């Protein structure tokens, strides 16, 4: 994974526009190793539930051992999405996530990657320079098991405004 210091200060010219996300397209990218230190740090700062912070509490929980917060998993997914394509795209942000499911726990030592499937792409009626992309994101662990799914919309500048 790229460190924050390695990220560009100014956005480069976009490689990907709305037209580059046809329905049915599937992209797989990213590699993020989950560390115990990161699980504990995220939990301390953002989700201080005992099963994310304490080995004994985690062992007594449904997780059976220390597990990452689901919100930490979302944050790791977002980082992989940024590095995988968003930082190189004409992204204009997102109006939101419509569905989010945590399917399996994420543990220290897991290695995650992302699969992104475009399920809808349409021009934005009120803004001819913008297109909407609905995507289904799946985060998978090293065994290929889905640990998280989410579906949401992204807004992207169009390369050719007004085209269909």
Sequence positions of predicted segments:
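HotDog/MaoC-like acyl-thioester-processing domains
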Residues: 2-22, 102-164
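Hot-dog-fold acyl-thioester-processing enzymes
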Residues: 2-96, 161-164
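Short beta-strand or tight-loop elements
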Residues: 95-98, 114
């Amino acid at each position: 994974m790229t460190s924050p210091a390695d990220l560009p200060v100014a956005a480069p010219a976009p490689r990907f526009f709305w037209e580059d996300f046809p329905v049915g397209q599937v992209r797989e990218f990213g590699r993020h190793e989950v560390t115990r230190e990161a699980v504990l740090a995220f939990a301390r700062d953002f989700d201080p539930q005992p099963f994310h912070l304490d080995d004994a509490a985690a062992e007594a929980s449904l997780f059976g051992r220390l597990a990452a917060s689901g919100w930490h998993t979302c944050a790791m997914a977002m980082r992989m999405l940024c590095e995988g394509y968003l930082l190189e795209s004409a992204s204009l942000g997102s109006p939101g996530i419509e569905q989010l499911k945590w399917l399996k726990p994420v543990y220290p030592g897991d290695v995650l990657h992302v699969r992104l499937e475009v399920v809808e792409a349409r021009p934005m009626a009120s803004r001819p320079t913008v297109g909407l992309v609905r995507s289904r994101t799946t985060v998978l662990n090293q065994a290929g098991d889905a640990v998280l799914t989410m579906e949401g919309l992204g807004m992207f500048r169009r390369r050719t405004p007004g085209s269909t």
